[in-house]
């Protein structure tokens, strides 16, 4: 291994660099969940119960997403209704 | 005023108990009346690291259940008369701790004029860990320069900022400090280990100190002496720096750079 190879490894391809990149992505992802209100799972469950009283939907037909930026918080509820049975 | 410090990490085996024992001894050596509490019910080990395992009669659960007074359960350290240890229970269920019980113990310690109470958290994020951090004023987040530990520390930071007494009551948040342990500057240089700067980039924490990977940590635990008492060792000195820095002394960081070899001593640029 030449001296040049040695420097290449310590810069871009080192395992420490890989570790840092992986952690930065992971931590950013996990922090985005951290600020979600704790009532979301319960809200999702109760909404589903109400909808199921009127429409025959599956468990996974509803998704609840919470997003936050500097100016506003958005609660997005998405319900997929079943195709009309004939 | 009593200051409550939690030593926490999320991940196990990163050096929480070693750190708790060392900093508690450090505060006491500087003349501050200090108590160190083991919150790891069922897996107590602080008594071993402090070298008082044969003097344990009562524990924190006995105090909470009224089976012993706090005075009966506190063990006075044999090296330093300003230091007291409150051991965890080895036999009880880990759910034996209660928030109310822990709160009462901390109030009683404040009434007895303890200046620092160090809470040695168990690993994980369950009840013991929750109660160890709940009443804290400051958090020492012990992290190894390693992916799993950094991730768990970040998770712990989220819990400190949302589930603590200070968070619930809308008080000033817990002050969080980074203690980077088992650090190896040699491995950082050759790209095998995350650097101090890398970990700080990810966690955005105030660095209280770096403790180098050191043989003295194991030898200190072998003989039941907090490593800070080994004043010649690098880890002992690193903990002494951390204690002084926390108490407000302006001490430059050490142990981040490699020790200079014989060539460095002769030809070193700085």
Regions found by a protein language model. Name each.
Chain B
Residues 4-68, 116:
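Walker A/P-loop NTP-binding active-site region of P-loop NTPases
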Residues 9, 38, 87-90, 121, ...:
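Flexible glycine-/small-residue-rich
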Residues 12, 63, 86, 120, ...:
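Residue-level signature of catalytic and energy-coupling elements of molecular machines
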Residues 25, 107, 130-131:
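Alpha-helical segments flanking ligand/cofactor-binding loops in enzyme cores
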Residues 39-111, 221-222:
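P-loop/Walker-type NTP enzyme "switch/lid" segment
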Residues 57, 71, 99, 103, ...:
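Amphipathic alpha-helical transducer elements in NTP-driven molecular machines
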Residues 111-112, 116, 122-208:
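Conserved catalytic-core segment of NTP-binding enzymes
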Residues 167-270:
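C-terminal lobe/tail of nucleotide-utilizing enzymes
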């Amino acid at each position: 291994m030449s001296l040049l190879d040695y420097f290449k490894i310590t810069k871009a391809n080192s395992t420490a660099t890989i570790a840092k990149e992986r952690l930065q992505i992971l931590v950013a992802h996990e922090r985005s969940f951290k600020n979600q209100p704790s009532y979301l799972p319960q809200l999702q469950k109760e909404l589903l119960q109400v909808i199921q009283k009127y429409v025959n939907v599956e468990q996974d037909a509803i998704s609840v997403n919470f997003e936050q930026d500097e100016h506003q918080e958005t609660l997005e509820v998405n319900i997929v209704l079943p195709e009309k049975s004939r | 005023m009593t200051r409550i410090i939690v030593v926490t990490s999320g991940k196990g085996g990163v050096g929480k108990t070693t750190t708790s024992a060392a900093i508690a001894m450090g505060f006491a050596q500087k003349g501050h009346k200090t108590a160190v509490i083991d919150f790891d019910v069922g897996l107590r080990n602080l008594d071993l690291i402090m070298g008082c395992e044969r003097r344990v009669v009562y524990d924190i659960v006995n105090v909470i259940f009224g089976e012993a007074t706090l005075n009966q359960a506190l063990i006075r350290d044999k090296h330093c008369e300003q230091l007291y240890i409150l051991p965890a229970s080895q036999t009880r269920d880990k759910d034996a701790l209660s928030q109310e019980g822990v709160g009462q113990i901390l109030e009683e310690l404040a009434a007895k004029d303890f200046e620092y109470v160090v809470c040695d958290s168990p690993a994980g994020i369950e009840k013991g860990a929750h109660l160890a951090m709940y009443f804290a004023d400051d958090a020492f987040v012990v992290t190894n320069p390693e992916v799993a530990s950094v991730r768990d520390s970040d998770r712990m930071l989220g819990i400190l900022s949302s589930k603590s007494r200070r968070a619930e009551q809308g008080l000033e948040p817990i002050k969080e400090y980074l203690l980077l342990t088992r650090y190896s500057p040699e491995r950082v240089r050759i790209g095998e280990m995350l650097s101090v700067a890398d970990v700080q980039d990810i966690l955005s924490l105030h660095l209280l100190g770096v403790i180098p990977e050191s043989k003295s940590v194991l030898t200190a635990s072998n003989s039941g002496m907090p490593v800070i008492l080994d004043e010649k060792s690098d880890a002992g000195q690193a903990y002494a720096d951390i204690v002084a820095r926390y108490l407000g002394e302006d001490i430059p960081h050490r142990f981040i750079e490699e020790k200079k070899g014989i060539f460095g001593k002769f030809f070193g640029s700085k």
